[in-house]
């Protein structure tokens, strides 16, 4: 949801903030940790905003592995990249992510011709965000402020992310973007408030902010990914 909901160029235009959207699709918090560490080697931010949508997901979800190419394929070969791949993927996946040409070697003609489908609609001037036009009928939605009682799989990674930020003079901020998700998914994200209070970290729970978001008009699909109208409101 962050790919579509946070537009760096609007932050620059409206507030003079320079930023980059480093989000990927189906991103576990363990993967977020590795993205932050590798990105900070190129440019250390003053502030890192961490989305908590997948706070309930463990890092070893096999169906999320393919999405990790969105980040790792752009990272040059290095010991740091190997450490990140090793920390976030099982050993049988390491070669594919360290040497991605083994995955694409039969597709060069398709890629060079420009006929291949793009997984992310992102241009350089969009600073990592994507823009998808359209409107989709959202899922049924009822707001809840309850919290999941038990600790969730992503909390350990969140703690490590916050510790890394503080050790490297980066201000950590947690965030939940509004979407027509189930009450259980909301309860999971609401639980991030407990961690934020414990560690004295800001938590922007935009489900409760007066953003003016209308899921009927501001989403391009039923899952609540924002179209440009929705992203502008966030």
Residue ranges and their predicted role:
Residues 26-30, 149-154, 180-188:
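Acidic-and-aromatic substrate-binding clefts and catalytic sites of carbohydrate-active enzymes
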Residues 2-84:
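Membrane-embedded segments
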């Amino acid at each position: 949801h962050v790919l579509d909901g946070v537009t760096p160029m609007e932050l620059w235009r409206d507030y003079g903030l320079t930023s980059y959207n480093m989000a990927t699709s189906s991103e576990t918090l363990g993967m977020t940790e590795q993205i932050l560490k590798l990105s900070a080697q190129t440019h250390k931010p003053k502030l890192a905003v961490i989305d908590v949508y997948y706070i309930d997901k463990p890092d070893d979800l096999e169906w999320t592995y393919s999405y990790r190419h969105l980040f790792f394929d752009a990272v040059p070969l290095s010991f740091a990249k190997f450490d990140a791949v090793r920390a976030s993927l099982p050993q049988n996946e390491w070669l594919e992510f360290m040497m991605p040409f083994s995955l694409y070697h039969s597709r060069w003609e398709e890629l060079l011709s420009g006929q291949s489908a793009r997984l992310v609609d992102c241009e350089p001037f969009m600073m990592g965000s994507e823009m998808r036009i359209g409107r989709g009928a959202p899922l049924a939605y009822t707001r809840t402020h309850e919290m999941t009682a038990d600790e969730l799989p992503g909390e350990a990674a969140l703690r490590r992310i916050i510790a890394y930020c503080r050790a490297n003079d980066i201000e950590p901020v947690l965030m939940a973007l509004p979407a027509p998700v189930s009450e259980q998914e909301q309860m999971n994200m609401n639980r991030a408030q407990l961690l934020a209070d414990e560690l004295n970290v800001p938590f922007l729970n935009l489900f409760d902010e007066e953003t003016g978001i209308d899921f009927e008009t501001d989403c391009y699909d039923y899952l609540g990914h924002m179209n440009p109208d929705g992203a502008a409101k966030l």
